[in-house]
Amino acid sequence: MGNCCVSRPSGADKRRRCGSSTAPHTRGGRRVIGAANMRCLSTVSSVSDAARAVMSNEPATVLGNSGSSGNGGVMAAEEMLRRYEIGEELGRGEFGVTRRCRDAVTGERLACKSISKRKLRSSVDVEDVRREVAIMRSLPAHANVVRLREAFEDADAVHLVMEVCEGGELFDRIVARGHYTERAAAAVMRTIMDVVQHCHKNGVMHRDLKPENFLYANASENSPLKVIDFGLSVCFKPGARFNEIVGSPYYMAPEVLKRNYGQEIDIWSAGVILYILLCGVPPFWAETDEGIAQAIIRSHIDFQREPWPKVSDNAKDLVRRMLDPNPYTRLTAQQVLEHPWIQNASAAPNIPLGEAVRSRLKQFTVMNKFKKKALLVVAEYLPTEELDAIRELFNMLDTKKKGHLTLEELRKGLQVIGHNIHDTDVDMLMEAADIDGNGILDCKEFVTVSIHLKKIRSDEHLPKVFSFFDKNGSGYIEIEELKEALSPRGDQKSIDDIFLDVDIDKDGKISYEEFELMMSAGMDWRNASRQYSRAVYNTLSRKIFKEVSLKLDHSGPLVAAGK
């Protein structure tokens, strides 16, 4: 098995001290990238000047001298503007924005994903970007993997020029088709597993397989489906085990929560996608994050609800074997592809799975977009506050002036100065900012991560998020306002289904109370933040397993061993 890159060494010392601000790179009195006259390549963040000051002590570069021009950051960005014309925005995420892009010479249509450096709040975030670029550059070409053309960097962002996918998300396409069958699900799963096998053969573990990370290249009926995001991927060697909790909650394998896993987690995540493809809802669902984690650990699969009684035995057998809680008896990617249901996909039942499945898929997809948009409103548009107070708090707690705090020093210090912060919140802060897992927080990470978690975690922001959607200030979110916010260019018809569920009193509009209920149901909306999700599920993992280190017994299921 070939390894396409080198994975992060565990236990490396990555601590950095708070330092002075670093001025952005300029040339001829202007920003090289970021000004409006530079073809709209401004950074997407509207975080306040205070947050900018905090983040300005990041390393000057993310990719180092790996920019396509060979001369490093700023020169690479100038080269990008010579080679490519940047167009309209295609979408936004937690770390940046994606825009249309065109090769200035050939006219080829591409996409430019710009990752804002101000959004890279810790060295883990920086390493995620470095790894993503390294993996996309080194992974051999595959028809169902989006191709990275070039990577550039400037003072504000990392820019990835890649294939453009304009055919929409996987679930959106399924919902739009209307007629949806088991045979169609089998064809989709074959494609997904081809990608997983390709990654595993080349020593790459994806670690974040979910429907949102699969897009169609174009709107044609026979368009290829492509995986687009390698932001959490890692390279591995046979037999290597990992303990970093990553991924999206619904798709997380039990051994991830147990902090001892290998490439088998990608099979589990694909199995969750398959379950959703066949019935429209996730297999492991609860009203709280802890409930979701517990459901994943229990791994009970419900085959009683519709349409499971009419789903073929072959399909159910494959779901069971992909969602086997024991990673050592779970199917490999090759075994999934050899399973009769996949091998004979054209023989799978071509009977519609029913309108209920299609409706559930639509609701699941649109609701996720609603919650992600709410997260972006908080992360992007609400001002950062209390920066100086947080830095002063760190200095107060750091009585020995070492530039870092242990978890116990943090706990005791907060008690001494009268801050009544719940243990869970203290644990979350440590989990989010303790980069190398050695129980130590440095100043910069304490400040930046506590700001981020405070903003994301506080329910006081929900009224402001509600106001963002309520454009006309009527006190209600009306359907046209929701369409404008969630689907300005896409198929707006799918937004209508939100009202069937969220609009409890059926008055054709969403009140604040209805909005609040929707935001608190199922997976916490704040888990759309990769950093928040990591912190929450790290804390839950320690709580569920009482800080017991778990080992994998090759002859049987997961067993626990004391530290």
Curated annotation (Swiss-Prot):
Ca(2+) 1 binds at residues 434, 436, 438, 445. It comes from the Eukaryota. Residues 385-420, 421-456, 457-492, 495-525 form the EF-hand domain. It is an enzyme of class 2 (transferase). A lipid is attached at residue 2 (N-myristoyl glycine). It catalyses: L-seryl-[protein] + ATP = O-phospho-L-seryl-[protein] + ADP + H(+); L-threonyl-[protein] + ATP = O-phospho-L-threonyl-[protein] + ADP + H(+). The active site is at residue 208. One of its GO terms (biological process) is intracellular signal transduction. Keywords: ATP-binding, Calcium, Kinase, Lipoprotein, Membrane, Metal-binding, Myristate, Nucleotide-binding, Repeat, Serine/threonine-protein kinase, Transferase. Pfam families: EF-hand_7, Pkinase. The keyword Metal-binding applies. InterPro entries: CDPK_Ser/Thr_kinases, EF-hand-dom_pair, EF_Hand_1_Ca_BS, EF_hand_dom, Kinase-like_dom_sf, Prot_kinase_dom, Protein_kinase_ATP_BS, Ser/Thr_kinase_AS. Residues 84-342 form the Protein kinase domain. Ca(2+) 2 binds at residues 470, 472, 474, 476, 481. ATP binds at residues 90-98, 113. Ca(2+) 3 binds at residues 503, 505, 507, 509, 514. Its EC number is 2.7.11.1. The keyword Transferase applies. May play a role in signal transduction pathways that involve calcium as a second messenger. There are 3 contiguous domains conserved in the CDPK subfamily: a kinase domain, an autoinhibitory (junction) domain and a calmodulin-like domain. The autoinhibitory domain (348-378) inactivates kinase activity under calcium-free conditions. Belongs to the protein kinase superfamily. Ser/Thr protein kinase family. CDPK subfamily. This is Calcium-dependent protein kinase 29. The gene is CPK29.
